[in-house]
Structures are given as C-alpha cells and as structure tokens.
Amino acid sequence: MSNQEYTFQTEINQLLDLMIHSMYSNKEIFLRELISNASDALDKLNYLMLTDEKLKGLKITPSIHLSFDSQKKTLTIKDNGIGMDKNDLIEHLGTIAKSGTKSFLSALSGDKKKDSALIGQFGVGFYSAFMVAGKIVVQTKKVTSEQAYAWVSDGKGKFEINECIKDEQGTEITLFLKDEDANFASRWEIDSIVKKYSEHIPFPIFLTYTDTKMEGEGDHKKEVKEEKCEQINQASALWKMNKSELKDKDYKEFYKSFAHDNSEPLSYIHNKVEGSLEYTTLFYIPSVAPFDMFRVDYKSGVKLYVKRVFITDDDKELLPSYLRFIKGVIDSEDLPLNVSREILQQNKILANIRSASVKKILGEIEKLSKDNENYHKFYEPFGKVLKEGLYGDFENKEKLLELLRFYSKDKEKLISLKEYKENLKENQKSIYYLLGENLDLLKASPILEKYAQKGYDVLLLSDEIDAFVMPSVNEYDKMPFRDASHSESLKELGLEEINDEVKNQFKDLIKAFEENLKDEIKGVELSSHLTSAVALIGDEQNAMMANLMRQMGQNMPESKKTLELNPNHAILQKLLKCEDKEQMSAFIWLLYDGAKLLEKGALKDAKSFNERLNSVLLKAL
C-alpha cells in the first residue's frame, strides 16, 4: 500500500518550530516524556485486560525496552502496551486534543527554563523528541487490531502513515538523532536519565546494549562483544514503598515524571491506611497551575489503582472539583479489580477514601498557611479554585473559610477571616464585603465612605467566583456575612434618615435630574451614606444577578438603575441655586458620568462626555 501523507495541525507546526529551534534548556526530558507515555500505554492495556472479555485471555509481561545504535545514531523506545491504530496516530500525533497547543503557545514567557516546564502539562510531550531527532519513526499495533501502522515525520510540517508488519501489540519509537545530540545513543547517558526521572515508573525498563571486554592473555588478547539486556529502574510503585525508605528527592523526582512537570511541587502527602479499609494515597500540591484548570473539560490529575493495577486517570469524582489542581495516586486494596465507571460513582469505599483524602489535603494546605510567604505561592495560583468548595462542600466549609484570603478596604495585603475578626470595631455586628469587577474600582467605591467613618473594614471581592459562592456562606465563627451595598448593612451603620425638609428642598433638583436622565435611570434618591462622593449608581436588586452572569461569562442586559445623590455635598448645594437650564443639564450629565466611571471604570459615550466637559470648562474660564 502506498504511503499516505498528512499535514500537521497549524498549531503543531508552530510548536515543532519552537521545540526544534528555541525550546529546551534540558533536552534530556524528551526521554522521560516518551517513557511516561509508554507507561500510560501499559496501564491502559492492563485495564482493558480486566474489563474486555475478548482480552481476558491475553498473557503479557508488561515492560519498556530501550536500545540504541551509536554508529547509526538511533535510539529506540518500545513498549507492549495498548498500541495505536491509524485513527489514533492521526489524532494523537497529528493534532493536539483540547486545544492544548494554543494554550501552550499563549502561556510561553520567553524564559527557556520556565517555558520548558510547561511542555508535559500541555500534552505535547511526544513532540519534545524533535528537539534531538531529525526524523522519528513510530511503528505500532493496537491490541484490538490485526493491522500495524508506521508513522514517519521529520517535523517539518508533514507526516506519513503506511501499513507495516508488527507481530506484537504495542508501540516502538525510533529516533534518528541529530549530530549534535548523538550523545543520547549512549548506555551511560540513557541509564543516567532513567535513574533521574523514571526510577519509580511501575513497570520494568530494560536497556539493551553491547558490552565489550578483553579475553585471552598476552598476544592472544582479543576484544569480545556481547549483547546484554539489563533492567535499569526499580519498577516499584513509589506510593507502595514505606515512607522511611524514601527521601524528599525521591518524591520530587517521581512527581516530575508522574505529573509531566519540571517544577518542584509545593508539598506532598503520602498516607497509608490499614484496618477496615486498606488504601494508600500519594497527593502532590503543584507550584504551577495546570493549563486546563478553568476549562470545563479539565483532565483529572489523580490516578486510581486497585492493588497496584491501573483503573482510570479520567474520573473527576476521585476528588471534588475545587481540588482539581491536585496530582497523585489512590491505590485501594478493597475495590474489585473489574470496577466500572458507574460502580465507582456510587461506591461507598471510594466515598470514604475521598472524604478522608480531602481532609488530608486541606490539612496540608493549612500547614502551608502557617508561613505567609509559602502560602502566597499556593494561594496565587489556586485560591480562586479553592473558593468553589464553599458552594458544594458543606462538610469542610469551616475549614475552607479558614484557608481563604481576601483583599480589604484597610489592608494592602491579603488577610484571613481570623485577622479580619481580630480587628473588629466595638459594636460591629457583621463581616462586610463588597462585590465588583476589579479591585481598583472596589477601592474607589463611594459605598465604602460611611464604613470608613465608622472604622469598619470591608472585604473587597473581585473574583468571578465570589458572586456565585458568597450567597451560600452565611457566617464565619458565629458572625454573619453582609453585602456592604445592601440596605440592611447600611442600616447597621446607624445612618439618619433624610428628613422631609431636605427632601422638599431638593424636590425641583431631583425632578431636573430625572428629566435629563430619563432614558438612563429609573429614579433619583437622596442618600445619607455618601460623604465625599456627589453621586452613586445603586442597584441592590440587580447587582447580585449581574455578578452571577459575569461569573458565567455572560453580560447582564443593560437595565435602568437608581441614581443616589449626596444632599450635603457642596456641588449639589450650589446646583440648588443654578438658574441656567442649559448649564444645569451639562452639570447633571457630568455628575452622572462621574458616577458611571466609579461604577464601571469606563463610559459608553466618551465623545459626549468630552464635549460636555469642554463646554463647562469654557464657561468657567
């Protein structure tokens, strides 16, 4: 059959160009990526052999074999895992799922060391081989298929797929190394890389090499070559080993291989439980957020094993979604080996493991929180996700509230709720918060003025998730939460009502505001909670809905709002005496525009605002 030629997805061409010309400061990681892929293929075959009736009689010894030819400058990585068919080759080696490449390319910083750390996270580990290889040949046969296929590419925009002969299922990747990277076709180089990155891959890795030794004596000495095959890794599932046998370095190197992440984890939790339930967990808190953390189709970072046999790496129920940044392993002794996805979702054993695991992880995060500098490294990438737990995890809500940090009116740095309570003023009855689109607008909000007079601090919440979760949080340490913009909260400040005399005094001015702004607002009210601000756009009824829609990525339909005026402000006192209708109209619009700026940070009609401002300035000069 003739070769079929295909073109790489556009983003892959960009990626390959990046890999080949400018990417890695540590090229050796390509081998870690290929070995990790081989291990995944073996895991998947093991699972199929448990669940697919047709494969239950299949007998294999799962392993990974490495070999090289220093003369021909080739390096081969071979596994007897699940293998691929033609469609798999096109999908996995011609495109990148989940738009990973686009996210990858946009995340690059230009710093080679930082950029190289991103490579495995974005599911592009295979392509890293083009950093050292001028050509790659992949021969593969899927376990459920009779036909084998070869994939060939030089990484320059195209690849070929053709039928080939291969007896055993699995995948064999041959790299034709570039001259400057021929050192990777070396026994000691390969051995060193495997021990560094893949020591605890749970399958044996064998290296085939030619050993040369001298035999005979004197003039009869001669060089004898012997081909040898040695296992070069421990092939022990690290999580099943005793903690006393492991060093910090062991955990960190395993993480890099397991999570495809060059950066070191912030922390790890290794736990073995014996008794009515027997299971082992090893969880890592990364230092870098997964690229797909805020995508609906995010990939779970936790693998489930039963008695060291891989079951799934795609079950989002293993941990709650607000802990989706966690990487690691759950290995149960009690679950049945042929457990199905449906059984997993309703399994009491797994529910107990999940509940205990969440408590362990939150306990570890609490330890990190004792050191502000360390906690900042955690909270900056993961704080927003952690907040999601307030909405669904009622069992751990109190613990989560302790772990959250907030900006506030009075503090420049993030504070805990405990710190907020420690600074409460006498007679303060609630924890006040204000929701908005960004921190700068919140800090400038006129709503804060009366709270400042009372000395009350206000939490400033600008994350999209805040509007979604705050209504579900009633109190912290027996103190209620209150939205600072709500009338209930303002009543707690003990503000005086606007008396009838003042209302009567401003009656005509309010009418003038309503006439000029009839297409913009639903009404005008005098407010007693403004101090230095002249006006404020208030919308207590719709504010929460607008924030919720923003959190869901939708825009709230434009609705008319109430304009609140400060009757004590000097500008309004002077406007009471203004008899020039045209000038008054310009002033009214400028005050409204100013209130809009404080609310939104921008104006819909900047041109008209500029014209009005120029007109007022001209008359004033």
Swiss-Prot record:
Molecular function, one GO term: ATP hydrolysis activity
Region (C): 548-621
Compartment list: Cytoplasm
Keywords: ATP-binding, Chaperone, Cytoplasm, Nucleotide-binding, Stress response
Database matches in InterPro entries: HATPase_C_sf (IPR036890), Heat_shock_protein_90_CS (IPR019805), HSP90_C (IPR037196), Hsp90_fam (IPR001404), Hsp90_N (IPR020575), Ribosomal_Su5_D2-typ_SF (IPR020568)
Region of interest called B, as start-end residue ranges on this chain: 342-547
Coiled coil: none
CDD domains: HATPase_Hsp90-like
Pfam families: HATPase_c_3, HSP90
Spans annotated as A: 1-341
Classification via SUPFAM superfamilies: ATPase domain of HSP90 chaperone/DNA topoisomerase II/histidine kinase, HSP90 C-terminal domain, Ribosomal protein S5 domain 2-like
The keyword Magnesium is annotated on this UniProt entry: no
Disulfide bonds: none
Entry GO CC: cytoplasm
Main subcellular location: cytoplasm
Function (record text): Molecular chaperone. Has ATPase activity.
Family as reported in the entry's similarity comment: Belongs to the heat shock protein 90 family.
Subunit structure: Homodimer.
Protein name according to UniProt: Chaperone protein HtpG
Lineage: Bacteria, Pseudomonadati, Campylobacterota, Epsilonproteobacteria, Campylobacterales
